[in-house]
Amino acid sequence: MAQHGALETLKDLAEKEVDDAARLLGEMRRGCQQAEEQLKMLIDYQNEYRSNLNTDMGNGIASNRWINYQQFIQTLEKAIEQHRLQLTQWTQKVDLALKSWREKKQRLQAWQTLQDRQTAAALLAENRMDQKKMDEFAQRAAMRKPE
């Protein structure tokens, strides 16, 4: 029974690890999604700003305003590049969290399999014991029966 309790405890710990890994994976995916949304917003803003620049250039633009546009676009490009790096980092975090979750899930399944085998072995032993008792009872009953 102590072994059964130990297996149960190990399986419970593995379940907790799987739950914790799933929570972490969810957090990493949310972070990655937010980084994707921020990057998209920056790219959209950059495209809109460039469109405004093209419109203003078509209508004529002062050189100092054109310089301001260029500087701001360069700043946006740097921000976009930084967000791309952040997105890459978030993607790596998601991949690691997913790998960890899969490993923990596999470990849990191994513990579950061991527990199932142990339960089946205990049931088989119990059935054999019952069969042995029934055979002994039948044998004693046959010996008492007068012929």
Swiss-Prot record:
Q: Name one GO biological process term.
A: protein transport
Q: What top-level branch of life does the organism fall under? A: Bacteria
What Pfam families does UniProt report for this protein, alphabetically?
FliJ
* UniProt keyword annotation of Chaperone present: no
Instruction: Spell out the subcellular localization from the entry.
Output: Cell membrane
A molecular-function term among this protein's GO annotations: cytoskeletal motor activity
Q: Does the record bear ATP-binding in its keywords?
A: no
Entry membrane topology: Peripheral membrane protein
Name the keywords, alphabetized.
Bacterial flagellum biogenesis, Bacterial flagellum protein export, Cell membrane, Chemotaxis, Membrane, Protein transport, Transport
Q: Membrane-spanning residues where?
A: none
This protein's GO cellular component annotations are: bacterial-type flagellum; plasma membrane
**What broad class describes the main subcellular location of this protein?**
membrane
- Read off the NCBIfam families from this record: flagell_FliJ
Family per similarity comment: Belongs to the FliJ family.
Please give the function described in this protein's UniProt entry: Flagellar protein that affects chemotactic events.
This chain belongs to which protein, by name?
A: Flagellar FliJ protein
| Record organism | Salmonella typhimurium (strain LT2 / SGSC1412 / ATCC 700720)
Lineage, top ranks: Bacteria, Pseudomonadati, Pseudomonadota, Gammaproteobacteria, Enterobacterales
